[in-house]
């Protein structure tokens, strides 16, 4: 059985010669007190019969509340610690983090309380330099930054 697949968008912009990437902070009680090493790209599962690029664009919109306005291009594949393969697409565009409006998920909280609560999939979004992103994002996603740097250098 193949490992689960997900797809995501590494949105980037170039300002004054410096590259920045947009990362989101996952919502919910597990992530609420985590910051360094907790940020990630907008991503999610690829539905049966769905193209990875379409899934990446859909997940971007679900987790940010904004449609992807740039054409995504294949960047890399990353295997996360649990074995899931993430197909990453790069797109150059701007996004205002203040406009973040993520879809929500429901879970029992507190545990064993019988109470269901809703939490946003992403509670914050932020532009970060590549150096800051390396420190702040999930370790398993950091190779995406190397792939983006290599892609941008090859375009020069």
What are the language-model segments listed below?
Residues 126, 130-156:
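Charged phosphate-binding loop/patch that engages nucleotide di/tri-phosphates or the phosphate backbone
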Residues 1-41, 89:
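N-terminal strand-loop-strand
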Residues 33, 49, 136:
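Residues that scaffold the ATP/ADP-binding catalytic core of kinase and kinase-like folds
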Residues 77-114, 126-128, 148:
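Active-site-adjacent beta-strand/loop module that shapes the phosphate/pyrophosphate-binding cleft
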């Amino acid at each position: 059985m193949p490992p689960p697949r997900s797809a995501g968008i590494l949105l980037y912009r170039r300002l004054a010669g410096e590259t920045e990437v947009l990362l989101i902070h996952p919502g919910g009680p597990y992530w609420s007190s985590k910051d360094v090493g907790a940020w990630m790209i907008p991503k999610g599962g690829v539905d049966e019969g769905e193209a990875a690029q379409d899934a990446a664009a859909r997940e971007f919109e679900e987790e940010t509340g904004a449609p992807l306005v740039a054409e995504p291009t294949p960047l890399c594949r990353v295997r996360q610690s649990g074995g899931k393969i993430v197909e990453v697409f790069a797109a150059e565009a701007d996004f205002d983090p203040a406009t973040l409006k993520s879809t929500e998920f429901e879970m029992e909280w507190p545990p064993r309380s019988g109470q269901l609560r809703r939490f946003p999939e992403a509670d914050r979004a932020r532009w970060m330099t590549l150096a800051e992103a390396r420190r702040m994002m999930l370790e398993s996603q950091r190779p995406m930054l190397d792939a983006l740097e290599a892609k941008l250098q090859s375009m020069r």
